[in-house]
């Protein structure tokens, strides 16, 4: 079961990513627990599997428009599908890596995998309830989903 301090670590990791990479802060909405099914995803989702002391998944899901603007904010003019996939994986990996500092070396993260499409299934660990952290940046909305045992 995740505790409030665990969620705070992910919130900080998320806001820190946008402050550094986009040089523009993101705001985070109130995290909420999903009690039935899996949370919805956007156009692109970067998935990180977690093992070690904690097990589960962390994923960052964002619409194409948000990722396109983020690439341009990073002075990248190539907004191809491949670059959008690379970016969403990088965001998920960086946020998880930032959190690893708080959770310690026993918080092992996989390289990111990327899923595209709204109906893409993300496998969640059985018996684990995901926490959704809404992210707002400029006029865009994304979400970080954390499901750890």
Predicted regions mapped to residue ranges:
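N-terminal auxiliary interaction/assembly segments of multi-subunit proteins
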Residues: 1-149
């Amino acid at each position: 079961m995740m505790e409030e301090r665990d969620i705070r670590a992910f919130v900080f990791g998320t806001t820190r990513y946008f402050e550094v990479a986009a040089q523009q802060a993101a705001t985070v909405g109130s995290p909420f627990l999903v009690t039935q099914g899996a949370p919805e995803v956007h156009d692109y989702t970067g998935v990180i599997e977690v093992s070690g002391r904690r097990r589960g998944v962390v994923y960052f899901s964002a619409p194409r428009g948000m990722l396109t603007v983020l690439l341009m904010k990073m002075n990248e003019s190539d907004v191809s599908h491949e670059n959008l996939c690379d970016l969403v994986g990088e965001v998920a990996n960086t946020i998880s890596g930032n959190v690893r500092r708080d959770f310690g070396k026993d918080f092992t993260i996989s390289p990111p995998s990327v899923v595209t499409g709204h109906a893409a299934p993300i496998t969640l660990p059985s018996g684990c309830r995901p926490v959704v952290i809404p992210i707002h940046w400029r006029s865009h909305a994304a979400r970080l989903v954390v499901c750890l045992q």
